[in-house]
Amino acid sequence: MEKDIKLVEQIATFKRLPKSDSRWCVAFYYIAKEFWDLEEVFVIIDKTLYEEQGLKIPVFREYKEAEGFQIFSSYIKAKEFVEKQGDLFVTASGEKLIGRIRQGAFREVFVPFFAEQNFNYLLNEDEALFADTFKRLLAVMEASENYIVDQEQEDLLKAGDVQGFFADICKKYIVLM
């Protein structure tokens, strides 16, 4: 919870800086660092894919001029987002489609894979919203671009089945709350 609060504070500081201010680089670094250091992140699961195919695929959405995977720094923020959306991310049985990704899987599988695919992320929402690229997150954190895969995932990648690989990592590493 403390890391989530620090992250929100860093985003607020970043948003107050004028574009001509050189301190934005430092503020950006601290946002990336706090995000990278979260023990877990939360994603909203696409309801249609979950109900029709049993897939736990995170929501890819648009916000103003940014598009990316919607990620939350705390369960509370994800839950508030889901509740604001009505039934859009709630199953008929009342299950909120919120998934958790642990730090290891996020850092070592999702971020490098998303960076390779040139995806962006939308972190949190409203006043705490921060949008950026997974590539820049990797670069700022000086992290490896390689991602850890098991044999099944390696076979999917060798066969060129990127969608199958993505579905597999989501199935294995996203836990519904």
Regions found by a protein language model. Give the residues of each.
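An interfacial alpha-helical scaffold signature
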Residues: 1-177
